[in-house]
Amino acid sequence: NQFNGVLVDLACLSFGFKVVPIPLNSTPEHVSYIINHSGISHLFICGKIGKKIWGEVKNSHDIIAIDMSEMNTTSNYAMNWNSFISSSDTVEEFDVDRLLAKVDINDIQTVMYTSGTTANPKGITFDQINIISKRFARALALPDFNSEDIFLAYLPLFHTFGRYFEMLGSIFWGSSYCFAESPAFNSLLNDFKIIKPTIFISIPKRWLQIYEMLQIEMDLFSEDEKIIRKRLQQITGGNLKWGLSAAGFLDPGTFLFFQSKGINLLSGYGMTEATGGITMTPPDNYVHNSVGKALPGINLKLQNDGELCIKGPYVTKAYYKENNDKIFKKGWFHTEDIFEEKNGHYFIIDRKKDIYKNSRGQTIAPQKIENLFQDFDAIKSIFLVGDGKEFNSVLIYPDYENSPV
């Protein structure tokens, strides 16, 4: 995450240039696939990981690569950031009004690729209606967010919450958007003290770490309420009012703890295909184990088997260059997740999909890992588990007849 990257993203979104964020946790093979599949012509690169991956795949792609750092360019890149900015002086007849007039809000504006699956990544398409309508939906669900708020942002900009909720949301609300120095927990603790955010969106792991930090320092069941609240304010900078735990499971007791200490911690259910959130726990109305109620502007229905289907202005219309017949039926997107609904609140029961997310928000594909063990004679069957957990566990049933042990 860096300022120059945000500028590139916003410029492309504003002028109708198709923009494709590439997840930094992609393998070099998947990066090559995304470049070819999406038809990228210009690639903006920053950070050690991005540069390392580009170094491995650059010989396979005839595209213009731009180093977003402001150091001298190297042989790996056509130009660096300063050269790129200076090149604008040579552009003739650049007509802003003409470019804006050509933008069609129904055209594909951005493609976000999935990561962590067994096959090639899927490109999820969004037009400007998808992006803009989601901003109004979030504003209706969170009417108290405003220009006085400060986001401490560390979620990656190739992630829907980092890109749509934090980056575009802060612009919509007129709030301050502050980059975290690093996603590491100790670094975030330092950022809390410096930035003093009012809003913090995170994977469950970080909320749990804050809770455990307090738990180590004091007995949370017997300590005076004022002392606990004061220490929590010291850790989070003193101004934190709102939180969101996204992309994984967080125990209801942890939610209630933060809410009882003055931080309105919210949760929800979402997916990239819906520009992020689909449901959200209403402020001051948390129900145990619920992922909340439907966000404004989206239609939800449950199939006979409980599968959740969604439709609305901020739901993608298609996967890029894919056969969409199985997942889009009569205008409804099938999530492949099983739910129950009680009094408007939704509860996740099971997943039709094989993939799951751990407590760090990382997407895990069990089959891909399980297949790595197929050739071991000593293993008869294997099962990977870890949905919502901090770690993954492999359950192995040995083949006692063929095992040398």
Regions found by a protein language model. Give the residues of each.
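Conserved AMP-binding/adenylate-forming
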Residues: 1-26, 154
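Short hydrophobic alpha-helices that are characteristic scaffold elements of the AMP-binding
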Residues: 9-15, 37, 159, 168-172, ...
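Structural core segment of the AMP-binding/adenylate-forming
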Residues: 14-86
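Flexible, low-complexity linker/hinge segments
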Residues: 74-108
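Conserved AMP-binding A3 loop
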Residues: 100, 109-135
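Gly/Ser/Thr-rich phosphate-binding loop
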Residues: 198-202, 210-286, 299, 380
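Conserved ATP-binding/catalytic segment of the ANL
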Residues: 294, 298-303, 307-358, 363, ...
